[in-house]
């Protein structure tokens, strides 16, 4: 029965469902988990790497799942990366055009809304398919300070304190975040919580920098700083967190 209604994005099923959008969301669940946590002094983004081939030259790419849109906003993705690249380039262009016109950074929510308008358009017109990617946006502006947003293939978006996208165990990730998040969480505590979430959701032992990506977004004085952990930094952080956990357990 569903096959009668899933050939085009412009057709609703009798139950009010748009199957092509649901299929796009299924593609996201097959991707590695990505976590975003809003702290009082910044934002943490962390992700599970799916590409772990030994012959892959990782030096040709800074990050597999995290991208800088502008000086004041970055994003992490889960889903089809080639779809994400199109939207990221569009977001960069939109942000640059806004700055050229108004001589100030584009408000984070306005930028997210503009990207999501494009995503929503791909669910309404014939001959197109939805973007099979979900985003976490981390940004700062003078209007609302630090902000974390999530968007999905339907074009819907919302602000979050902590959330996760992708991964087969997304419900586990959300449960861990709900149980451990607190409003006054610091950046360091948010990094540790992100590691805890990914450790719970990943089906792998020996967690290390080959399987994870970590970054944080904060302010130093008047400057917005975005830092992606190097492999050495991430391995050191994982080791330090494990030692602290062992000390607490003892």
UniProtKB/Swiss-Prot annotation:
Task: State the GO CC annotations.
Answer: cytoplasm; cytosol; nucleus; proteasome core complex, alpha-subunit complex
User: What keyword terms does UniProt attach to this protein?
Assistant: Cytoplasm, Nucleus, Proteasome
SUPFAM superfamilies from the UniProt entry: N-terminal nucleophile aminohydrolases (Ntn hydrolases) (SSF56235)
| Quaternary structure annotation from Swiss-Prot or TrEMBL | The 26S proteasome consists of a 20S proteasome core and two 19S regulatory subunits. The 20S proteasome core is composed of 28 subunits that are arranged in four stacked rings, resulting in a barrel-shaped structure. The two end rings are each formed by seven alpha subunits, and the two central rings are each formed by seven beta subunits. The catalytic chamber with the active sites is on the inside of the barrel.
Q: Where, per UniProt, does this protein localize?
A: Cytoplasm; Nucleus
What biological function has been recorded for the protein in this entry? The proteasome is a multicatalytic proteinase complex which is characterized by its ability to cleave peptides with Arg, Phe, Tyr, Leu, and Glu adjacent to the leaving group at neutral or slightly basic pH. The proteasome has an ATP-dependent proteolytic activity.
Q: Which GO terms describe its biological process?
A: proteasomal protein catabolic process; proteasome-mediated ubiquitin-dependent protein catabolic process
PANTHER family associated with the record: PROTEASOME SUBUNIT ALPHA/BETA
Task: Identify the domain of life.
Answer: Eukaryota
Between which residues do disulfide bridges form?
none
Q: What PROSITE patterns does its record include?
A: PROTEASOME_ALPHA_1, PROTEASOME_ALPHA_2
NCBIfam families in UniProt = PRK03996.1
Q: What taxonomic ancestry is recorded?
A: Eukaryota, Amoebozoa, Evosea, Eumycetozoa, Dictyostelia
Q: What is this protein called?
A: Proteasome subunit alpha type-4
